[in-house]
């Protein structure tokens, strides 16, 4: 399920939800293995293997660049293993606009081998042209990311991580 529950000139909210065929621990572990599911087309380097996500105080969803540089995509602000992962920051083209965002993944066990994953990204801030025009592209990218995440969990080794 996907929805854009709020789209305003000064912000928007993107929400996606799906069920994955693993328990909450495996679902959470795969969230952290972001290089296994993030679309390389939505990186600066074009290489998903350059991505990392550290679930620790001040942890980073970061990307190493070939020239020795890096990109801090988001900063980890809440990590509750098996339950919630929240990151703060502005993804992609939002970064240079000076807006803020909160990306939250919530995991809810439906049964022993089925977890509901909800992605919610709330963005706010003022820009000269407003943020309404960015809501649908961000919704598309994050919806695709969550689908890739779910597909990666269908791999035979997913439940063993």
Residue ranges and their predicted role:
Residues 2-50:
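Hydrophobic ligand-binding cavity/cleft-lining segments
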Residues 11-19, 48, 60, 71, ...:
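Intrinsic-disorder/low-complexity, polar/charged segments enriched in Ser/Thr/Lys/Arg/Asp/Glu/Gln
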Residues 34-73:
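Short beta-edge strand/loop motif at the mouth of beta-sheet-based domains
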Residues 51-52, 67-114, 122:
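Hydrophobic-ligand binding "helix-grip"
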Residues 116, 122-161:
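A conserved amphipathic terminal alpha-helix motif
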């Amino acid at each position: 399920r996907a929805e854009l529950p709020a789209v305003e000139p000064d912000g928007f909210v993107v929400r996606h939800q799906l069920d994955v065929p693993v328990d909450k621990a495996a679902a959470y572990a795969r969230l952290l293995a972001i290089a296994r599911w993030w679309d390389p087309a939505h990186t600066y380097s074009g290489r998903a293997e350059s991505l990392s996500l550290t679930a620790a105080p001040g942890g980073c969803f970061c990307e190493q660049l070939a020239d020795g540089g890096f990109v801090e995509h988001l900063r980890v602000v809440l990590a509750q293993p098996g339950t919630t992962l929240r990151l703060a920051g502005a993804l992609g083209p939002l970064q240079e606009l000076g807006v803020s965002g909160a990306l939250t993944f919530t995991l809810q066990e439906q049964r022993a081998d089925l977890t509901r994953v909800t992605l919610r990204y709330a963005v706010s801030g003022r820009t000269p042209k407003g943020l309404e025009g960015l809501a649908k592209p961000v919704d598309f990218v994050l919806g695709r990311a969550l689908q890739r995440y779910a597909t990666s969990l269908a791999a035979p080794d997913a439940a063993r991580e």
